[in-house]
Amino acid sequence: MIKAVYPGSFDPVTNGHIDIIQRGAKIYDEVIVLVAENISKTPLFSLEERLDMLRHSLKDIPNVKIDHFSGLLVDYLKKIDVKIIIRGLRAVSDFEYEFQQALTNKKLYPECETVFLVSDLKYTFLSSSMVKEIAKFGGCIKGLVPDYVAEKLYEKFKVK
């Protein structure tokens, strides 16, 4: 059984994330969506809220599990004996950062490999930050995030 980990803050999960997860789930026997607990920026949603939105959004993909971690990704990978990291690339600008991350992870855990999946063209502009900004001002986020996530965003920003 080949497992892969797709790490991120998922603050919140977007349809772009879900596209990468669905595609990863077609390639690997199991995809573990891993929510970072100790991200450098303060998240809008708590860890429990992010996990809840992921559970709702990914419930129809049978070979996807959701977990969370605090600390180095490679330590988590070693703990569960997984050697594959999935990362999505929206644009060339993502590549430089992701390439550095992949090399660092490889240095810390030589057995691990990072697999890059290029975003679907319709999601290349999409980011969690952009979605939060639109929702904050009451803009339409239909098609950018699952409906459940949109509800949670509007609730958080008290938008009717």
UniProtKB/Swiss-Prot annotation:
Main localisation: cytoplasm
One GO CC term on file: cytoplasm
Residues the entry annotates as binding substrate: 9, 41, 73, 87
Chain positions of site Transition state stabilizer: 17
Disulfide bridge positions per record: none
Domain of life: Bacteria
UniProt-annotated binding residues for ATP: 9-10, 17, 88-90, 98, 123-129
Pathway listed: Cofactor biosynthesis; coenzyme A biosynthesis; CoA from (R)-pantothenate: step 4/5
A Pfam family this chain is assigned to: CTP_transf_like
Compartment annotation: Cytoplasm
Catalytic activity: (R)-4'-phosphopantetheine + ATP + H(+) = 3'-dephospho-CoA + diphosphate
Reported function: Reversibly transfers an adenylyl group from ATP to 4'-phosphopantetheine, yielding dephospho-CoA (dPCoA) and pyrophosphate.
Name this polypeptide is given: Phosphopantetheine adenylyltransferase
The organism's taxonomic lineage, starting at the top: Bacteria, Pseudomonadati, Dictyoglomota, Dictyoglomia, Dictyoglomales
